[in-house]
Structure formats: C-alpha cells, structure tokens
Amino acid sequence: EKWKNICIRQLTKDKVTMREFNKNIRSIVKEFDEIELLDIKKPRVGIVGEILVKFMPAANNYLVDLLEAEGAEAVMPDLMGFLLYCAENANFKKDYLGASKKSAFINNSVIKLLEWFRKGAKQALKESKRFTPPATIQETANLAKDLVSLGNQTGEGWLLTGEMIELIHNGAGNIVCCQPFACLPNHIVGKGVIKELRAAFPEANIIAVDYDPGASEVNQLNRIKLMLATANKNLEKSEN
C-alpha cells in the first residue's frame, strides 16, 4: 500500500523523470527482497491464458487468491509481454506474409522503446536475491517456435506456448491455462500443446481450465485441486 501510494503520486505529477522512476523501482525491489520469510517450501504455479481471463480476477474466479489459500505460490507473467508480442509479430509478417519493411521497422522501434522503459526494472530484478527478470520477447519467441509456428498470431498465439516454457524453465512447472469456453486460439496454442510440452518436459504439470458463466465452478475447483495435489507430491519427491 505504501509503494502503491508513492507510485500514484509520482505518475500523477506534471513531469515524471526516468531517473525518479528507476529509483522507485530499485527501492521497491530492495524492500520486497528484505522481507523476512518463513522457511516454507511451496509449489510454484504459473498462470497463463487468454488476456482478460488471465488478468481479471472476476473472470477467473479469483484464481490467485485460490492458489495462495491452497498453499501455493502464484506466478504471473507480466502484461508487457503481450504488448511486446503484438509488436514482434510484424517480423514474421514481413518475412513470410509480404508485410512491409516499414511496418516491421516501426514495430521493432516500439519493442526497443518498451524494453528501454523496463530496463531499470529488469536490472533491479536481476540483481535481487528472490526475483527473476522477464525474458526478452525474442527469447520467448525462440522458446515457442520449437513447438508452434510464430504464424500463430490470433489472440495470445505463440506467446501462450512461450510463456509456459519460460515458466517451466523458471521452476514453475505447475501451470493453469485459463481460457474462455470455446476459445479456438487458446485450444490450439494452449490446450493443444500440453501433450507436446509434457513430452518435452516430463516434470510439467499443466491443466487447462475453461472459464464461462455457464461453467461449473466445482469442476474448475476440482481440476485445480487435483493439479495442486500432484504439485505437492512432486515437491516432496524433489526434497527427498
């Protein structure tokens, strides 16, 4: 709450400098890094999926709260990744779909600008003891293209697959893939690649959960609890 108020005050000023912005970022990471923690091992659970269902608590039945109440650590890839993904798509369109070089140049410039904005945050996270900086969008694309074509650009497209692989590499192999009922892009690049992900990463523990006004909340809860039971078993095995 303290840093929320500080950030609101900073961003509502007439002028915001990058120096002050990065200073606040470093201070936020430092303070969170110094919070005393209990010596408790929890399974890390990544959350991916359709952009609205993923980030809006009311749309995913407050999934983060549920996971934390069940004793797990929720891991959420950032929203900036989706913006970078939208810009990165221009390179595939230029190389294979006849899009203009000008469009690719503009979008690559946008990527550089967005990366410049979050450079301070990534550096602070990299230097921290507890946090992992996000990968570049090019790194995420390279992870995804082994399983799906980068031409999958409808909705979250290849980003969804790339985020799941990135989560597995970062120790969050337990993943909930949130999707609206009958969302075709998600079924292809989310649910559709789970089998291949399990083949490539045997330790992966992934479930796809449909969120829809007509969907049974009990079924959602049962699937998530079953995944968490497997996650806890895997955690116990790794500690022995």
Locate the predicted segments by residue.
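An N-terminal assembly and electron-transfer interface module characteristic of large anaerobic redox
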Residues: E1-N240
